[in-house]
Amino acid sequence: MKVKINEVHSVFAWSWHIPSTSDEDAANNDPIGNDEDEDVCGICRASYNGTCPSCKFPGDQCPLVIGLCHHNFHDHCIYRWLDTPTSKGLCPMCRQTFQLQKGLAINDAHVQKFVEIVSRRREEMIEEGVAEEFVDFDEPIRQNTDNPIGRQQVDTILDEDFLLR
């Protein structure tokens, strides 16, 4: 018996490797237990493995970024969000200061673009005279002298200094 192959059609699938955010997730590396609702961009609600509304094709042209607060977004979505006056430099999901998580290969290519957008937005707000509303990206951890514990992470929404400005 002889077999002649006329055509070959390759089929493949890919997905982003998003580092787990907790020790429990790392210990339980079972993809069956993952919640599908968590695999969407918090801004455009499109799948991470799909594209944002700005892109036509998934992959390197529509990459992800991971915030220090462990929220993930398409890079086009978060940059467009951070460039709006209402964002005030905060994560759209948890309203903490949005910063790229350091030490992740997925974020390395976006650091310079992130710094440029934040700097440009800060300069625009200074010109408009509303720079005090912009959250300082350089100091996400503040010294709390009333607390005997000392340095602590401050939730930006509940920070009294922020509310009084």
Curated annotation (Swiss-Prot):
CDD domains: RING-H2_APC11. Gene3D superfamilies: Zinc/RING finger domain, C3HC4 (zinc finger) (3.30.40.10). It comes from the Eukaryota. One of its GO terms (biological process) is ubiquitin-dependent protein catabolic process. Pathway: Protein modification; protein ubiquitination. GO terms for molecular function: cullin family protein binding; ligase activity; ubiquitin protein ligase activity; zinc ion binding. Keywords: Cell cycle, Cell division, Ligase, Metal-binding, Mitosis, Ubl conjugation pathway, Zinc, Zinc-finger. Its EC number is 6.3.2.-. Pfam families: zf-ANAPC11. It is an enzyme of class 6 (ligase). GO terms for cellular component: anaphase-promoting complex; nucleus. A zinc finger (RING-type) spans 52-95. Present with 377 molecules/cell in log phase SD medium. The APC/C is composed of at least 13 subunits that stay tightly associated throughout the cell cycle: APC1, APC2, APC4, APC5, APC9, APC11, CDC16, CDC23, CDC26, CDC27, DOC1, MND2 and SWM1. Probably catalytic subunit of the anaphase promoting complex/cyclosome (APC/C), a cell cycle-regulated E3 ubiquitin-protein ligase complex that controls progression through mitosis and the G1 phase of the cell cycle. The APC/C is thought to confer substrate specificity and, in the presence of ubiquitin-conjugating E2 enzymes, it catalyzes the formation of protein-ubiquitin conjugates that are subsequently degraded by the 26S proteasome. This is Anaphase-promoting complex subunit 11. It comes from Saccharomyces cerevisiae (strain ATCC 204508 / S288c). The lineage of its organism: Eukaryota, Fungi, Dikarya, Ascomycota, Saccharomycotina. The gene is APC11.
